[in-house]
């Protein structure tokens, strides 16, 4: 069963990557911006809870963490070769000249968001806040190097 799921995941990714490779650069950039918007949409309320701007709600926090963990793996698809130009973007050209490093940083985001979802599901506020800082660090590592100010 696990092998079947893994095969389906690989085939799904290959199909999505192939479809994105056939898209115009501006379509890929639109996709990228959309994924990042959804990630930010879910990150912001979690950040507000961690910073104490709003009361911590474990159920809401876990919902946002789960959504973020679902979106993070999709981010890399939005940085397809040739999508460095074609529309207004905050992505620095260094992404494509240092793609392995960029990909590594995005993989860190995927891993930290997955862990965030698992920790948040357990409902422990202190542990969720601690993991959120690691998640924020993964975001910051990529933004500092690869996102225009």
Which positions does each model-derived feature cover?
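Positively charged n-region of N-terminal signal peptides that target proteins for export
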Residues: 1-5
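Bacterial N-terminal signal peptides
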Residues: 6-15
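Sec/Tat signal peptide C-region and signal peptidase I cleavage site
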Residues: 16-23
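Sequence context surrounding c-type heme c attachment/ligation sites in exported
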Residues: 26-58, 64-149
């Amino acid at each position: 069963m696990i092998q079947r799921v893994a095969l389906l995941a690989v085939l799904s990714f290959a199909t999505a990557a192939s479809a994105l490779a056939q898209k115009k650069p501006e379509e890929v950039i639109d996709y990228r911006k959309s994924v990042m918007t959804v990630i930010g949409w879910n990150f912001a309320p979690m950040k507000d809870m961690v910073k104490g701007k709003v009361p911590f709600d474990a159920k809401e926090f876990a919902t946002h963490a789960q959504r973020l963990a679902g979106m993070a793996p999709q981010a890399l698809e939005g940085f397809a070769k040739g999508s460095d130009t074609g529309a207004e973007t905050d992505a620095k050209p260094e992404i494509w000249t240092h793609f392995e490093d960029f990909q590594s940083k995005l993989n860190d985001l995927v891993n930290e968001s997955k862990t965030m979802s698992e920790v948040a599901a357990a409902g422990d506020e202190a542990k969720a806040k601690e993991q959120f800082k690691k998640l924020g660090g993964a975001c910051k590592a990529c933004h500092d190097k690869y996102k225009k100010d």
